[in-house]
Amino acid sequence: MKKTILCLVVMCLFFTLQHVMAARLSDEDLAKKIEGWYPTGLPLVNYDSDNGFGYGVRAYLYNNGTRDDEYFAYAPYKMQLYGQFYQTTNGYQYHEINLDMPYIFGTKFRIITSIAYDKKINANYFGQGADTAKGKLTLFTTYPTAFERFDTYQDYLDYADKDERYLKYYNYKYTKPSYFLNVYRDITQNLKFLIGLEVKKVTINTWSGEKFDGTSQETTLLEQLQPLGYDGGWSNFARAGIYYDTRDYEPDPKTGYLIDYAFEISDNTLGSDYDFTRHTVQLQYYLPLLQSLTLALRAGYTDANGDTPFFELGYFGFSLNRRTGLGNNRTLRGYREQRFVGPTMTVANAELRWKFAEANSWGQNFQFKITAFYDVGNVYDKAADPFTHPRFGDYHQGYGGGLVIAWNMATIVHFYYGMSKEDSSVSVDFSHTF
């Protein structure tokens, strides 16, 4: 009953509170913003350290409206619709249709909705929790008392090349068809509110006993540990969030800040097989050092409580987008995807973004930026541990740089190379890390 009353109160606030308009584009960027409908898109020919060489296409359709529109100077676009077909040589598929409409039909609401099919036959599972994250990679062999430990991921690969029975020891397979709908509303000039729902069916399989390159695989780490979620199932959850946003332009900020809190709840009333909650907070800050040079900073924290399946532990549930962590191009570059996972995770990122060139041709605007970054993150077992037992010496660090291209300001393509003491990573993908 209390949950029902709380939901009703939240919905009443959501639909009745008034606001004024959001942060405005600079005059320089406003002059570059084109009017009306236009397409963009790229063939997806890229490489990712976790997923191998990828190929496919992502096509965008934008509508910016006209300069006379009330929200032209405030919204990143009037509508963004994209469709994606993508698969890789390492067995990853991600196909999606996504629609984003800020100030939909001239109202103060925004909707983001997506339907996606996500399949991976080499998803990573390195264990979970603080002890696992701060220890060495450990491979338990077929004998219960025997194990191998590795200082780096490359050391493990060298071992597995010699004993191919363990090539898939840290891998498993999943399929995740999903749908989500997020509805946002401005409360004040910069304060925004979110309610949303995600529905996802997860199917899990292991490599144990199957053949890879003709070699039968030994029992994998996932099968040895059999964490909650090992059998897959429905993972449905509702979301609510509130954030304060003064950024000048959401896809590619140069100034301003974002303070964000989001709450997620999953239980059987939503048709979920799991009962858990998640709290996530983040701060983003953008400081223009020079006209063409921006310092971008982010700090994030997330905590999951209850019966959280292992495949949901590795997420930061930010209001505008959920990000996998810790590892790969969305949180901790220089490490494998979801290399460090636990109930409580922290992340911090610093980037320098320098626009060194700009070109205009056939009515299209292209901006080219060099970026240098430094990332850190850690895993904890309890919500208060980052503050009461921070273990600063255990923070994992990654660094590197790359190229970012902004196409008509709204379509962001990045080329990152990240390094760490354990591994390196390459990423060619859309959007900034933050």
What are these regions (language model features)?
Residues 46, 62-64, 100-104, 184-188, ...:
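Structural signature of outer-membrane beta-barrel channels/translocons
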Residues 30-41, 45-228, 234, 330, ...:
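Gram-negative/organellar outer-membrane beta-barrel architecture
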